[in-house]
Structures are given as C-alpha cells and as structure tokens.
Amino acid sequence: MSEHPGIVFLAGPTGRRASLASGPDVWEVVRAIKSARTSEPDLTEEDVLALVENNTGVPARMLRIAIRYWASYPDEINSEIAAAQVAEDAAEHAWQRERDLLAG
C-alpha cells in the first residue's frame, strides 16, 4: 500500500485486515501497545516500544508502521481489537462451562 509502506492486506474469516508485511496484524500490534501502556503508564514512548518489541519480537520500526496505520484508520483497527476481545471472551466462557460440567 503506497500510502502505508510495510502494510499488506490479508483475507481471512473476519474479512480483509491490515497486517505488517513481515509480521502480525496491525490490530495485534496496537493491542499489545495499548496493553503495555496500560500496564506500565510511566514508561516513555521509547520504553513502551522496547517492551513490546521484547515481548513480541516485532522490531520497533515495524511497530511504528503499525502505529501510523492505526493513526490513519483508528476505527477500523479498534473495531478489530473489540471483535477479537469478544471472541476471546466467548471462548473463555465456553471453556469455563466445560470445566464446570466436568468438575461436577
């Protein structure tokens, strides 16, 4: 994508989604950054990027590419983050119901 070098689009069960050309989906990166910022509110911008880089293996320059894409399309990426959270919550609830049934 010429407007956002380093971003590609992938098709999947949830539709077309923005992804780093050599890494995870943009929504996954943004969620990791938001999580790091929430968990470590006193970190500097560079420290947040270093934390996410160390935890994900995604280089800081690629994290910045994802951030730039999010800055242009925040509603799209935030919607994908919300949809992922709903799916994860549903899976966790189903797992818990299964555990409850088996526990008697």
What name fits each language-model region?
Residues 2-21, 35-37, 50, 54-55, ...:
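Long, charge-rich, low-complexity intrinsically disordered regions
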